Amino acid sequence: MLGLNNRFRAASILSRQLFVHLTLLFLSWLAVPPSALQAQQIRLPSAKGGVADLSAKQQRRQGDLYIADGDVDLHYGDSRLQADHVEYNDKTSETIARGHVLYDYENQHLEADEVHYNVSTGRGSFRIVHGTIKIERRPNPTLLLSDNPLYFEAQEVERYPGDVYLVRHSWITICDPDHPQWQFYAASARIRLDKTVALVNANFRLFRVPLLWLPYATAPAGRKVRESGFLIPDVGQSSRKGFIFGDAFYWAPTSWLDTTVGAQYLSRRGASERGELRAKPFEDTSISYSYFGVDDRGLKDSTGVRQPQGGEQQRLEIDSKLPWGWRFVTDYNQLSSLTFRLAFADTFGEAINSEVRSAVFATNNFHGFSLNFAALNDKNFLTINPQTSVILRNLPEARFGSVEQNPWAKLPIYFGFDSFVDGVHRSDNLVDTPLTVSRTEFAPRVTIPLHIADWFGITGTAAFRTTRYGDSLNNAGQVGSVAITRNTGEFSIDLRPPTLERFFDRTSLRRDKNRRRYKHTIEPVVTYRYVTGVNNFADFIRFDSNATITDTNEIQYGFTQRLFLKEGDDQPRELLSWSIFQKHYFDPTFGGAIVNGQRNVFQALNSVTPFAFAFGPRNWSPIVSDIKLTPGGRYDVEQILQYDPHNHRLVTIGTLLKVKPYSEFFATIAHFRLDDNPSVSDVQPPSPLPAFQQPLSNQIRALAGYGSETRKGLNFITGIGYDFTNKTLQNQIVQASYNGGCCGIAFEYRRINLGQVRTENQFRIAFLIANIGTFGNLRHQEKIF
């Protein structure tokens, strides 16, 4: 009994002690002010009339100064300042923050030990800083872009209104700041958002190893920013040019004008100069000019004598929309010699282009009429040793014409016309005309379209053409001052028989698949054409296609088959097309225009194929077949075949295949073969094969790769150009690159083989810095072929 009472007394004592402790705890909780349990929040005035929101665990006021401690959070407009300790002056808006300071404004984030900042003006200073600034860049297919912000660390940062930062003793990168692949160390840097990043006394480091010192460097820091200054130097090696070193200066004085001027030192050749100007002074006017030249010492030949191949090329382009519907266009091109282009063109495709064309014209189209004034010049280089060329010039030229117009609404009769007046010139090894040969032409026409029911169409066109040339060729093929006139009558009938159609419905048995419907069509076409009145074809000087009109009596016939696919409610798309056509000539001599023993080129022939096939009288043209397979997606195929019934063989084979079998893989193959030389029977009377055979052609271009120039990860591309006839590898390229999140590296090997003029091996390397540019001599904007 005594033990039970003792246990009960002990339990009572414990209960009283617990009650006392709980009571004291409750009273102490009631004694704590609310401000001690949560952050104090107040609204403070600023110097410019704005309002700053301040919250902290503890804060007090001393005159104009508010002092806050503990999780301090200060908001003013779009800016935010967080710190352990903040002193704010509501008269001047000056703020001092210390301890774990965080500053945020739009896409700017800074962390510092101490900050002096004016919330009203946005000006401040930061000490012991690391931060990020998000810089938006405009998409660029030739520039590696990264979504990473600009990271930097600095001893001191000054911020100025207008989003301008002056950074001292800093490093800058867009890589992972803990493991940066590259960094810029700069004694001083200026960052102007949506403008530029400028570095003073900087050095570039790769994996923390200093590689390049720059006294001053700038880079764009916005979507539409152009910054004047020197570009990244160009360094490389070539088997024919030697060691290459160059640089260029970019100048953008206004928002509508920029220019680039640069030069390269070529240790084995001399020096090259480049220039480019772009301008858009008005909304509808654009101007561009480019120049490239080489002062070449030349390479030594087998006798030890240097053979210079230098020269220059330039191009001027102007496109402007003028008042009252006028448009003015200039495309002026100048090339000093084909040898220069073959020797110094950057790519194989540029090197083998032997044509230089220039045009200046003003045009106005109104109410179905067209008025044009032009100056044209076409120079085609033929050989390089000796250098020969053909020059064709139209200066000046005025043309006036109209489309078919119907003056009577109830009658299907349409009228139109073409006319021109110009001065023309031709210069080659055989013909050299005066500087200006006058020429005029007027050609009215009438067109009558007829429809038999709704399934058969007939369109007839009749035209009269009168043409006068101020000079002509005499019987010896020499230019004479005798004027010549041509009056031709032209008639054509275009027959459109009904299109044959058949539908195939392959309805899917699965409800989750779209219904597929196919349509197969056969479209026949027959065109008859008759031209008479060209009685002296050999007397006309070949200035352009106008001089190649001949008498003809011909019919062209053929058909086009198409296969369409319609999936669900989508629009139909063409999967396959196959066109076959041929011409029959009732007059095999074309009014006596055919010349035996030479290639004949005029309108009645080259309207079928661009390759000469008539070396004597012909009744039949080659049969032309054009097949296009375009299912979309993984592959596209086109093949052109030309079969000559006179020679009983395929004379032209052209094949183009584009494949994208999987993911980022792609391949393009183009093969072309031409064998259209005459047979013995082409020459009347039959004789051994003449010496006028046109060159054979059998070439292939192949390009395959994975990825793209600016894709993240591993990318590669390889291509060749091979000439089967000459058994020559004309062009070869191998390019491999790897792009990371903030940088990339690329290697390239090129070989260009142009016979005795140029056989060159090029080795290129580039280091790509995301959002900035490329170090090295590999320029992604260059075309491979």
PLM regions with names:
Residues I42-A47, D53-A56, D69-H85, R98-A112, ...:
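Interaction modules related to DNA damage response and DNA replication/repair
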Residues Q108, E114-I172, P177-H179, Q183-S188, ...:
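Outer-membrane beta-barrel proteins and related beta-barrel translocases across Gram-negative bacteria
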Residues Q17-P33:
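Bacterial N-terminal signal peptides
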Residues Q41-K48, F243, L629:
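Extended, small-residue-rich solenoid/repeat segments and analogous flexible loops
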Residues L37-A39:
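Boundary at the C-terminal end of the N-terminal hydrophobic targeting segment
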Residues M1-R16:
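N-terminal secretory signal peptides that target proteins for export/translocation
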Residues K57-R60, Y88, E158, Y706:
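Short, exposed beta-strand/loop patches in secreted or surface proteins that constitute
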